[in-house]
Amino acid sequence: MAETSKADGGRLTTHVLDTATGKPAAGLSIALYRLDGSARTHLKTVATNADGRCDAALLAGAEFRAGEYELVFAAGDYLRGQGTKLPEPAFLDSVPIRFGMAEAVHYHVPLLISPYGYSTYRGS
């Protein structure tokens, strides 16, 4: 994917891969929050499609603002829905990822999950 120009206003995307099965994590719920000091504002909740991606950018164009954000991935619900036996409480249930976006370009924040671990990075 090419970076979005500053004139386009930037965008935020994500995708989720289940590293235990080697497949996209379809149907995983993701909540997006904007952080402003101690305030945390819910912007939207979406679910991943069959490819583990969201059907549209989480933020794009006029919706995009530089700042601090948080994505909360409902990993436990997804894993239980796949038939994965998890202890109660689950080792990983909600997986929060906090990050900053400083300029109006494309930010891609993927998540790789399994019942006992996860990783993320700034993708392209």
Curated annotation (Swiss-Prot):
Keywords assigned: Hydrolase, Purine metabolism
SUPFAM superfamilies the UniProt entry points to: Transthyretin (synonym: prealbumin)
Listed Gene3D superfamilies: Transthyretin/hydroxyisourate hydrolase domain
EC number(s) stated in the UniProt entry for this protein: 3.5.2.17
One Pfam assignment: Transthyretin
InterPro entries listed in its UniProt record: Hydroxyisourate_hydrolase, Thyroxine_BS, Transthyretin/HIU_hydrolase, Transthyretin/HIU_hydrolase_d, Transthyretin/HIU_hydrolase_sf, Transthyretin_CS
Gene Ontology molecular function: hydroxyisourate hydrolase activity
Any GO BP annotation: purine nucleobase metabolic process
Residues reported to bind substrate: H15, R53, Y121
Domain of life: Bacteria
Catalytic activity: 5-hydroxyisourate + H2O = 5-hydroxy-2-oxo-4-ureido-2,5-dihydro-1H-imidazole-5-carboxylate + H(+)
Binding partners and assembly: Homotetramer.
Miscellaneous comment in the UniProt entry for this protein: HIU hydrolysis also occurs spontaneously, but more slowly.
Function recorded in the entry: Catalyzes the hydrolysis of 5-hydroxyisourate (HIU) to 2-oxo-4-hydroxy-4-carboxy-5-ureidoimidazoline (OHCU).
Family, as annotated: Belongs to the transthyretin family. 5-hydroxyisourate hydrolase subfamily.
Protein's name in the database: 5-hydroxyisourate hydrolase
Organism: Mesorhizobium japonicum (strain LMG 29417 / CECT 9101 / MAFF 303099)
